A protein has these predicted regions:
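Membrane-interface transmembrane helices that cradle and orient dolichyl/undecaprenyl
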Residues: 4, 123-126, 165-182, 210-218
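Membrane-embedded, lumen/periplasm-facing catalytic core of multi-pass transferases
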Residues: 399-459, 472, 476, 480-485, ...
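Hydrophobic, aromatic-rich transmembrane alpha-helices
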Residues: 4, 212-216, 296-346, 380-383
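Multi-pass, polyprenyl lipid-linked donor-dependent membrane glycosyltransferases
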Residues: 34-37, 102-112, 134-164, 169, ...
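Transmembrane-helix motifs of polytopic, lipid-linked glycan transferases
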Residues: 10-11, 105-126, 164
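Hydrophobic/aromatic-rich transmembrane helices and adjacent perimembrane loops
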Residues: 115, 155-158, 190-193, 199-202, ...
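Transmembrane alpha-helix segments characteristic
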Residues: 12-19, 139, 185-187, 316-321, ...
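Signature aromatic-anchored transmembrane alpha helix within multi-pass, membrane-resident enzymes
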Residues: 11-15, 130-133, 185, 202-208, ...
Length: 567
C-alpha cells in the first residue's frame, strides 16, 4: 500500500500541473514578451541547422553595447541570455515543426515536475502528508506567478532544476553524498538556463565549506556530513555539463559573460540606460550619481525584490504563514540550502542588479524558491491553527487545519486564474500590435530580407519573419546612425512601449527626413489617464526608413499612397 501511495500522489500532482499548464497554453499559446520570443527564435534557428546565430539585435549589449566597427547581421546568439531554454525546444520542433506547441511543450512537461518535487522534498524533510500535498498543489498553481508557467521561458525550466539542486544539497547535509554530487549537474543545467544559476552553486559551495569547518572545529569528534569525494564530484559534474558552453563563449566572444563585460549589466544608474548606446557604462559614470542615489537604488532594488516575491509567489495573503514556517524551520538541514540561496539571491539582486529587478530579472530566478516556500506556507498554517486552538477550546485542530489548508489552495486557484486572465489580456494586446505591423509589412510587399527597427526586435522577428535591430533609447540622430549602420528599411513604433525620442512622431508631429509617412497606422485610443492626445496620434504605426541614396519611399510624392491603416 505504501509504495502505491508514494508513486500515486506525486504522479497525480504531476498530471495536475501538466493540466494547469496545458490550460494556460490553450488560452494563450504564443510567446508573450522579449525573453520568450528570443528563446523561440534561437530554437528555430538551431532546428533549421543555422546554429546559435540570429538575424536581429534585441539589445545592443549583445554586440558590445554600441554600434560595432563592423555592423553586420546575423550575429552569434546568447551573448546575454543562456541557451538551455532554446535547446530543449529543438527536439520538439523537429518532431512537431516550428509551432507554438513544439516551443511550449518542453516547458509544460519540465515545469510540471516541480509539483511532485515539492511533495517529495516536504516528505523527505519530515513534513506531514497534508503539508506535502498542499505544497505540491500550490506549486502546480503558483498563485500570481501562474500565467508565466506555460511560456517558452525559464520559469518552467529553471524552477525544477533549482528545487532539485537545493533538495539534493539538503540531503548532502544529512550524509547522502550521492545526492550532493548530483546537485553539481543540476546546478550546471540551472546555469545553462540562467547565468545567475551559478548562485545555486555558490550556495552549495558555502554549505560544503561550512560543513567541513564545523567538523574541524569539533576537534575530530564530528565527521563532515558531506564526503570529500561528493564535493569533488559535485564540482566535476558542474564542469562536465557547463564547461562546453563556457568554452564556446570564450571562443566566440572572448568572455565567459559577454554582456557583463560591456558594463551595461552592472554599471547603469537606471533601467532606461540599459537600452542606450550613448550613455557610458563605466565605473566613473556609475559612481558619479553620488552616494545618496546609489544607496537609494540598492534599497529600492531590495524592496522591489521582496515585494515582487511576496506578491507573485505569496499572493501577499500567504506571506505571514511562509514567515512562520520559515521560523519553525530555521535550524532545519533540509531547508538550509534554500534559506542560504534566498539570502544570496536577494542580496545579489539588491547590490548588483537593483535597477533590473522591476524588469523581471529577479522573479525569473526567485521562482526556484517557490516549492520550498509553499512547504513553509503549509507548515505555517498548521502551526498557526495549533496556536489558536490551544487558546480556543472549541477548535478541532485536525478539522481547522484541513479547512485553512484547503482555503490556501483555493486562494491560489482563484488568484492564479484571475492573474492569468488579466495577464493574458495584456499580452494579447501586445500580440495584436505585432500582428498589425507584420500584416502591414506583408501588404507592402516587404521582402523577408528587409531589416526592421522596433522596440522588440525578437518579437518582430517571431511575428513578421524579418530581422533587424532594437529601437535604442537615445536621441533621434543616434537612432539614425543605427538605422544607417544596419541598413534598416522599416520602423515600427508602438505607444505601449516606446522611447522618448519618438513620442512626437507617435503624436502626429514632424518626422525627420529619413522616416517616411506611415504605410499603416492605428489611431490612438483615448488615454486612460484622461489626457487628450494631439490630433493624428497613433497607437502603432509602420514607417519606411530611407537611408540608402536611391530610396525614394520617404519623399512627399509617395505620401498619399503610403498613409492609411489596416483593418
Amino acid at each position: 500500500m505504501l509504495p502505491c501511495t508514494i508513486v500515486r500522489k506525486p504522479l497525480l500532482l504531476f498530471v495536475l500541473a501538466i493540466a494547469v499548464r496545458a490550460v494556460l497554453f490553450l488560452h494563450f499559446p504564443d510567446p508573450a514578451y522579449p525573453d520568450s520570443y528570443y528563446y523561440v527564435d534561437v530554437a528555430q534557428s538551431l532546428a533549421a541547422g543555422h546554429g546559435f546565430n540570429i538575424d536581429f539585435i534585441w539589445i545592443f549589449v549583445e554586440v558590445g553595447g554600441k554600434i560595432p566597427a563592423n555592423p553586420v547581421l546575423p550575429i552569434p546568439a546568447d551573448a546575454h541570455w543562456m541557451p538551455l531554454a532554446s535547446i530543449v525546444q529543438v527536439p520538439f520542433i523537429w518532431l512537431l515543426g516550428p509551432t507554438t506547441l513544439a516551443s511550449s511543450l518542453p516547458f509544460i512537461l519540465l515545469g510540471a515536475l516541480s509539483a511532485p518535487m515539492a511533495w517529495g522534498l516536504a516528505r523527505d524533510a519530515g513534513a506531514s502528508e497534508r503539508v506535502a500535498l498542499g505544497a505540491g498543489l500550490l506549486t502546480a498553481i503558483p498563485v500570481l506567478a501562474t500565467p508565466f508557467m506555460a511560456q517558452p521561458d525559464n520559469f518552467g525550466l529553471y524552477q525544477p532544476l533549482v528545487v532539485g539542486a537545493l533538495w539534493a544539497g539538503g540531503r548532502g547535509l544529512k550524509g547522502h553524498g550521492r545526492s550532493f554530487a548530483l546537485a553539481g549537474a543540476l546546478v550546471a543545467l540551472a546555469t545553462l538556463a540562467r547565468s545567475d544559476g551559478i548562485l545555486v552553486g555558490v550556495t552549495l559551495g558555502l554549505l560544503f565549506v561550512a560543513d567541513r569547518g564545523r567538523a574541524w572545529r569539533s576537534g575530530g569528534v564530528r565527521r563532515p556530513a558531506i564526503p570529500l569525494w561528493a564535493g569533488i564530484a559535485c564540482a566535476g559534474l558542474f564542469l562536465l555539463v557547463a564547461g562546453p558552453w563556457f568554452a564556446r563563449q570564450l571562443t566566440v566572444f572572448g568572455s565567459l559573460s559577454p554582456s557583463s563585460s560591456t558594463g551595461k549589466v552592472l554599471l547603469i544608474r537606471t533601467f532606461s540606460e540599459w537600452n542606450s548606446i550613448t550613455i557610458p557604462a563605466t565605473v566613473d559614470h556609475f559612481l558619479g550619481q553620488g552616494l545618496g542615489p546609489l544607496i537609494a537604488s540598492r534599497v529600492g532594488g531590495l524592496v522591489a525584490a521582496v515585494t515582487i516575491y511576496a506578491v507573485l509567489v505569496g499572493g501577499v495573503v500567504l506571506v505571514p504563514f511562509m514567515l512562520i514556517g520559515g521560523w519553525l524551520r530555521r535550524r532545519s538541514l533540509d531547508f538550509s540550502p534554500a534559506f542560504l540561496y534566498a539570502g544570496i539571491l536577494f542580496a545579489f539582486n539588491a547590490l548588483f542588479f537593483a535597477v533590473h529587478v522591476p524588469g523581471g530579472t529577479f522573479i525569473h530566478s526567485a521562482i526556484g524558491l517557490a516549492p520550498h516556500s509553499y512547504v513553509l506556507v503549509m507548515e505555517g498554517i498548521a502551526a498557526s491553527v495549533g496556536w489558536v486552538a490551544a487558546r480556543r477550546r472549541g477548535w478541532d485542530v485536525e478539522q481547522a487545519t484541513r479547512v485553512f489548508s484547503g482555503a490556501a489552495v483555493a486562494f491560489a486557484v482563484v488568484a492564479g486564474a484571475a492573474a492569468s486572465l488579466t495577464t493574458h489580456a495584456t499580452w494579447a494586446s501586445r500580440v495584436a500590435d505585432h500582428q498589425f505591423a507584420a500584416a502591414a509589412l506583408d501588404a507592402a510587399g516587404a521582402p523577408f530580407t528587409d531589416r526592421v527597427m522596433s522596440i522588440d526586435a525578437s518579437g518582430t522577428r517571431y511575428w513578421s519573419g524579418r530581422g533587424g535591430v532594437v529601437l535604442v533609447n537615445d536621441p533621434l540622430p543616434t537612432v539614425e546612425q543605427v538605422a544607417r549602420a544596419y541598413e534598416i528599411r522599416w520602423l515600427i513604433l508602438e505607444r505601449s512601449d516606446a522611447v522618448p525620442a519618438v513620442a512626437p512622431i507617435l503624436d502626429g508631429g514632424a518626422r525627420p527626413a529619413w522616416i517616411g509617412p506611415p504605410i499603416a497606422s492605428r489611431p490612438a485610443a483615448p488615454s486612460s489617464t484622461g489626457v487628450e492626445l494631439p490630433p493624428g496620434s497613433v497607437d502603432v504605426a509602420v514607417y519606411p526608413v530611407c537611408v540608402a541614396p536611391d530610396d525614394t519611399r520617404c519623399s512627399g510624392a509617395l505620401a498619399g499612397a503610403a498613409t492609411g491603416s489596416l483593418p
